[in-house]
């Protein structure tokens, strides 16, 4: 640990966190430590992995989906994963009487989500709200570790910001200092990032097995050597029931502490989502996003990520999420929209998808790497061009031909389709 400035002669309560986000706690964190912005302010991780493998998996039918989600490294008061603690330190307090005592606690909305541990010689000890620090302890300066029991789900509930309050009481004298922290946002991956794992469902459908074989071959040609990871579900649409993201917190020397997150689509009756709980492990959590039943607009096929960019003076270093809204009856559930609004770092772009039956943005827009100033380009479905192909076929005398060759597709001719306004 780096030394902090020596304590003044007169008693002063001082608490620091990694406000400047350099992965260390020292005097450089003193400025604006009670403020929090996109550029400055201490970060906490929602410690939702399963380091010891103590949580049950999706095959345990005695547990509900909510119970499976509830088990993680922060679901009790033990330090299961201290590597993901945010460092907090108090400056030594001198000039106190032997009867003086101190407290450290999270205050304000959401305080119950914050866990605080104190580092003792024998290891980390959970520090409850009613525990007191002795005058002797206060005189030495102390180290704490802080994490969160949960992610940020909705600003209407909690925006993830918390205040740690350090209070020293010596008779009638009360000294107080504060530092502001916020739970790390869940950031969605974009298509410029290098893949290190590729997931596919385990399906018995011949057409899906063929797809998996083709995908495996394409990955091999691209130089991807890791084996395909499997979801234990026959739901073919992995893109629809899960989106992957991560939370990160600065560590020393430019490194970062990262917890990966599998985000279940807000379709609680879509059973495939339960299979995600098998992924939970060290530094890997699974979260549910609420929702109601199984509505297509809440599929994560209706979610993409614009890669990082700058435009008109605005910067989006983590990119932006993009989803579709088809209006009454086909709009995403409020749990869906609230979740992505609450993260703050990937300001959503909303597109009109009312012209689509399924109303998913991934049906007509994708973002691809490109050799240009942005490093990416947009692939957009050209619907007018498709109609022009049909009109040309009609003009060439093929109006009676079937539009679709698949036997389960709508049976209509080119003439019928073009006449349907």
Predicted feature residues:
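Histidine/cysteine-enriched polar flanking segments
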Residues: 1-421
